[in-house]
């Protein structure tokens, strides 16, 4: 999305860059509007030094506001997260909300933030949240601004709980330390979906000039429109969470030891409180990682999904105190990774799909014990995204509840869960393979705090039966059928290459012909959610919503395998997800793993063609 063309202004004196006129205009306008001395000074220096390349990076194109909001590095310019772009974004969002809600000035919005900061540009999540609050308050809109850092799920919880019009969370979740983001929730408590992203985007373009009091963030401290929900929401959230504690007596007596890491993010205090709410002894926190630190000094990437590299300190502490289970939240505590020490002495990090199987089984089992009336099953649902394991489908088929698949991302599951709730249905659980879990539908998004404590209760309960998480997972696969999954990605920074790669798959054996084989593996069905084609449907049209702006093709194979190739919405990656599903009974998991490895090898060789497209494999 190109930046709105500003009014004609002469280039800053002495720029002498001979830059294209638009860049001159953008930088001149920036210097008129930006009141942050660090970012405005850095732009002046780039102009004085004639650093055209860096100026193009900063001013080439405005950050695109999508359904995930914004995510970009912090720094100067319209392509970065900084004071001015936060002001502009919030002004647009405010105007859009005014059009959508006649009672915006009665209901208001909630804003919270994580612990990120970027001293070089003076940007931080806290400051961005205060500037966003200022924009709404100057327009007479009540703002519920948390006084300190919170997990991301507290924002959708507050929207639903206080019946607000919208929520904003300033976070870049598990991205590298230089990034920040702006995540938006609608009045139903779920992340926005189209067409709201386009409407907000347009409103941002129409409201680029800072309003008269935009920079006066001290306004928020004295405004009667400002409310601090920290104490009441914290209290209410943990009261609601207690309803999902099924074995309080077991918890009180549990001898299972847990290690928890918040990976320098916001999770520590909240997970401690969650354990207290469940009457579990508090988990042992990794001391080097428990306090928020925007530098993330002990990890290369603050992403627990990366596995053992992020968990090294957790394993060391667990070995020291003889704990068998590690719980790891990402920095904004909306996701959860779990590892368990095996009898061999090795640590097993569960994949998102494996933990989805365990939590899904547990929440259904616990619900069934409380609801003896089996007629309720027809109104009971679980959800997962289309690239996640189909294990919940297998459990649903055998147990008699409903399973639904959505597009990738919790925005789809949150909105679907809300629709089902409105129809009087019960949504027990939703998950995605990227270690995101919705265990309690009072938050219509992934929540790593509730997932951590529910996982701890599950482990404590299993311990009374002398079972480990790994043993229970195996029992689930024996009962409902083995579901062996794998996922990886290739890095590709060039959009043209990505278009060519997917274009080749759509014209594999001549124009408009998808592949019929992948190496030795026969393809039985193809669904392309970029074009809306699905040859398993009678009319060849896909049932799930399609999006021309992202690439996504799913191949079903004659051997029961399913593989999806898709582009990432937030990173320069082409991802793939593959699964082999076997019917219930004692299948041979080793044989299935071998067959899945062969299938993935064929997909990499024939469909990705990394040499031809110069793709960079995932670093092991």
Swiss-Prot record:
The keyword Secreted does not apply. Highly expressed in lung, spleen and thymus. Expressed at lower levels in liver, brain, kidney, skeletal muscle, testis and heart. GO terms for cellular component: cytosol. Keywords: Carbohydrate metabolism, Cytoplasm, Glucose metabolism, Isomerase, Magnesium, Metal-binding, Phosphoprotein. It is found in: Cytoplasm, Cytosol. The active site is at residue 173. GO terms for molecular function: magnesium ion binding; phosphoglucomutase activity; phosphopentomutase activity. Disulfide bonds: none annotated. GO terms for biological process: glucose metabolic process; glycogen biosynthetic process; glycogen catabolic process. Binds 1 Mg(2+) ion per subunit. Monomer. Belongs to the phosphohexose mutase family. This is Phosphopentomutase. It comes from Mus musculus. The lineage of its organism: Eukaryota, Metazoa, Chordata, Craniata, Vertebrata.
């Amino acid at each position: 999305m190109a930046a709105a063309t500003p009014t004609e202004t002469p280039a800053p004196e002495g720029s002498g860059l001979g830059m294209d006129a638009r860049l001159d205009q953008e930088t001149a306008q920036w210097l008129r509007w930006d009141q942050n001395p660090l970012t405005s000074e850095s732009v002046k220096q780039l102009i004085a030094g004639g650093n055209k390349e860096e100026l193009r990076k900063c001013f080439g194109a405005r950050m695109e506001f999508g359904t995930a909001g914004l995510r970009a590095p912090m720094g100067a310019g319209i392509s970065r997260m900084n004071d001015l772009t936060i002001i502009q974004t919030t002004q647009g969002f405010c105007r859009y909300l005014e059009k959508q809600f006649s009672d915006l000035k009665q209901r208001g919005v909630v804003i919270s933030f994580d612990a990120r900061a970027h001293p070089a540009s003076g940007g931080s999540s806290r400051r961005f949240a205060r500037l966003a609050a200022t924009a709404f308050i100057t327009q007479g809109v009540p703002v519920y601004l948390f006084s300190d850092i919170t997990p991301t799920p507290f924002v959708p919880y507050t929207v639903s709980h206080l019946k607000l019009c919208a929520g904003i969370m300033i976070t870049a979740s598990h991205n590298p330390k230089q990034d920040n983001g702006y995540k938006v929730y609608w009045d139903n408590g779920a992340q926005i979906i189209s067409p709201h992203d386009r409407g907000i985007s347009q409103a941002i373009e129409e409201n680029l000039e800072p309003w008269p009091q935009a920079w006066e963030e001290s306004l928020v401290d004295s405004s009667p429109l400002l409310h601090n929900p920290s104490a009441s929401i914290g209290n209410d959230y943990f009261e609601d969470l207690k309803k999902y504690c099924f074995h309080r007596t077991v918890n009180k007596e549990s001898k299972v030891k847990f290690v928890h890491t918040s990976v320098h993010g916001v999770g520590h205090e909240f997970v401690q409180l969650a354990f207290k709410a469940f009457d579990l002894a508090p988990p042992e926190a990794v001391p080097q990682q428990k306090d928020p630190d925007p530098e993330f000094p002990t990890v290369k990437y603050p992403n627990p999904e990366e596995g053992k590299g992020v968990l090294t300190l957790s394993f060391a502490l667990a070995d020291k105190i003889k704990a068998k289970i590690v719980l790891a939240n990402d920095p904004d505590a909306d996701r959860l990774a779990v590892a368990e020490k095996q009898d061999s002495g090795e640590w097993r990090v569960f994949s998102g799909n494996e933990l989805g199987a365990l939590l899904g089984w547990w929440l259904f089992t616990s619900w069934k014990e409380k609801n003896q009336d089996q007629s309720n099953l027809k109104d009971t649902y679980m959800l997962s995204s289309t690239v996640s394991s189909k294990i919940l489908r297998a459990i649903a088929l055998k147990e008699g509840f409903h399973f639904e698949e959505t597009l990738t991302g919790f925005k789809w599951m949150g909105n679907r869960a809300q629709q089902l709730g409105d129809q009087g249905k019960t949504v027990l659980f939703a998950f995605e393979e990227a270690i995101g879990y919705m265990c309690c539908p009072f938050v219509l998004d992934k929540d790593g705090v509730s997932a951590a404590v529910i996982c701890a209760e599950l482990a404590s309960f299993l311990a009374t039966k002398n079972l480990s998480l790994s043993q229970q997972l195996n029992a689930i696969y024996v009962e409902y059928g083995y579901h062996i999954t794998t996922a990886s990605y290739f890095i590709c920074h060039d959009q043209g290459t990505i278009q060519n790669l997917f274009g080749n798959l759509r014209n594999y054996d001549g124009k408009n012909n998808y592949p019929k084989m992948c190496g030795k593996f026969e393809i039985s069905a193809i669904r392309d959610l970029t074009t809306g084609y699905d040859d398993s449907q009678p009319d060849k049209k896909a049932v799930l919503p399609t999006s021309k702006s992202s690439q996504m093709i799913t191949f079903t194979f004659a051997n029961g395998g399913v593989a999806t190739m898709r582009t990432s919405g937030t990173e320069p990656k082409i991802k793939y997800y593959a699964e082999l599903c076997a019917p219930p009974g004692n299948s041979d998991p080793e044989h299935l793993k071998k067959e899945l490895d062969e299938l993935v090898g064929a997909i990499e060789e024939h469909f990705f063609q990394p040499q031809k497209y110069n793709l960079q494999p995932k670093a092991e």
